[in-house]
Swiss-Prot record:
Keyword Metal-binding: yes
Subunit structure: Homodimer.
Gene behind this protein: mshA
Name of this protein: D-inositol 3-phosphate glycosyltransferase
The keyword Transferase belongs to this UniProt entry's keyword annotation: yes
Catalyzed reactions: 1D-myo-inositol 3-phosphate + UDP-N-acetyl-alpha-D-glucosamine = 1D-myo-inositol 2-acetamido-2-deoxy-alpha-D-glucopyranoside 3-phosphate + UDP + H(+)
CDD domains attached to this UniProt entry: GT4_sucrose_synthase
Organism: Corynebacterium kroppenstedtii (strain DSM 44385 / JCM 11950 / CIP 105744 / CCUG 35717)
Length: 451
């Protein structure tokens, strides 16, 4: 396996160290966090990076602050990344070489699970470190974590973030369903992991209903938001954001933030806006679409630009590249409304970030969004994805300045209940309980069943 050089570099504001000796012991234990298919330092909104990346990085940093030693394992995608990235005291990102740096689609990554697992084992042996617990994220990492759990004889905590059967039950028109092979892998993880962590009670219900999970093995941990990064701006800051984005100061602005794929519903918003402009052609409306193509959207990267043009609304729609949090905050502040027409969201981090920025949210009543939004107080929940219904909900806020402003003020208060520090404390309790009990032992041929 290639080893990184001895120099120190900079990447996304963190130091990259090619060699870093590990502490042999720590009062709180050492955690192996596994995120095979996407790195937590990748830009959200690019490729497969999204809320899960923010979740892993944010909780890991908070766990490090609590005294845990956290090693996050991800698949290397660039030779310049270095072997070890020091994100913070106690928190390291380990780039494991498994297959070529480029050229593999997300659907092809399962072919590298053995190589990735081998790389983790080699790293632990070479560094002479042992782990108290494994926390895997997403189904591919769950499969890797399952093997390491049995090898290291430590408990495995797993967070799915999304589930094949849940996604397939709410597909957008034209979206490709998740394969049965993924469903089987998810079932195996559910059957073998020591603890399952979900973002909401709805996520818990989905595991029980679709995967026959034992509810006693499921913990609900609400994600958080960086309220220091995302906070309401002054009128002057809002004006500056609009000027930088090329948006008229007196226009009503609707923003979409997320990956450009049908599952996230950008087509719903664009059709709703076309409906709004048809009924109210004289209103000064602008739409900001912030994000890059991902998943099935990679097959047609200009699909939504083409749709805006076909609908005749391209003069009022601006597509923005994904941007880091410090720049994304200005998009939220520039907007009067943030729209989230997703077909499924395990939580809805964008909703919390937008509300923390003082912007009301109009979102689909799907997944965890009813938890992140206080319907009628900090935003509006829309049943279904009919563009006409979305046009009605959006227009109601565009036309009522007092209601929209009041919702924005309420949104800030509502978002304050979501904290990464609180999430990490809850995870710590789960970890300590799992470590105390140790990995459960299952004997018999059903451990790898495909039921």
């Amino acid at each position: 396996m290639h080893q990184a050089g001895a120099s120190t570099r900079r990447l996304h504001g963190v130091a990259i160290l090619s060699t870093l000796k590990s502490m042999s012991t720590t009062p709180r234990g050492r955690i192996a966090v596994i995120s095979m298919h996407t790195s937590p330092i990748e830009q959200p909104g690019v490729g497969d990076a999204g809320g899960m990346n923010v979740y892993i990085r944010s909780t890991s940093l908070e766990l490090g602050a609590l005294g845990y030693e956290v090693d996050i394992f991800t698949r290397a995608t660039r030779s310049s990344q270095g072997k070890i990235v020091q994100l913070a005291p106690n928190v390291r990102l380990i780039n494991i070489i498994a297959g070529p740096y480029e050229g593999l689609s997300k659907e092809e990554l399962p072919t590298q699970m053995v190589a990735f697992t081998s790389g983790i084992i080699e790293f632990a042996q070479c560094e002479k470190v042992s782990y108290s617990l494994i926390h895997s994220h997403y189904w591919m990492s769950g499969q890797v974590g399952w093997l390491l759990r049995d090898l290291w004889r430590v408990p495995q905590v797993h967070t799915a973030h999304t589930l094949a059967l849940v996604k397939n039950s709410a597909l957008a028109t034209g979206d490709r369903p998740e394969p049965e092979s993924r469903r089987i892998c998810e079932q195996q993880i559910v059957d073998n992991a020591d603890r399952l962590v979900v973002n909401t009670e709805a996520g818990k219900d989905n595991l029980v209903f679709h995967y026959d999970a034992d509810p006693e093995h499921i913990d609900v941990v609400l994600p958080g938001a960086d309220v220091t990064q995302f906070s309401p701006g002054s009128d002057r800051a809002t004006e500056r954001s609009r000027r930088e984005l090329g948006v008229p100061l007196h226009a009503t602005v609707i923003a979409f933030v997320g990956r450009m794929q049908r599952l996230k519903g950008p087509q719903v918003l664009l059709r709703a806006v076309a409906n709004m402009m048809k009924k109210h052609p004289d209103q000064e409306l602008r739409v900001l679409m912030c994000g890059g193509p991902s998943g099935n959207g990679l097959a047609r990267p200009t699909e939504f630009e083409d749709l805006a043009r076909d609908l005749g609304i391209d003069p009022i729609v601006r597509f923005l590249a994904p941007r880091p949090p410090e720049d994304l905050a200005s998009v939220y502040r520039a907007a009067d409304i943030v729209a989230i027409p997703s077909y499924n969201e395990s939580f809805g981090l964008v909703a919390v970030e937008a509300q923390a920025s003082g912007t009301p949210v109009v979102a689909a009543r799907a997944g965890g969004l009813p938890i992140t939004i206080d319907d009628g107080t900090s935003g509006i929940l829309v049943d279904g994805h009919d563009p006409a219904d979305w046009a009605t909900a959006l227009q109601s806020l565009c036309d009522d300045d007092d209601r929209r402003i009041a919702m924005g003020e309420n949104a800030t208060d509502h978002a304050s209940r979501f904290s990464w520090a609180s999430s990490a404390r809850h995870l710590s309790d789960i970890y300590e309980d799992a470590i105390r009990k140790g990995p459960h032992v299952r004997c018999g041929s059903d451990r790898a069943g495909a039921s």
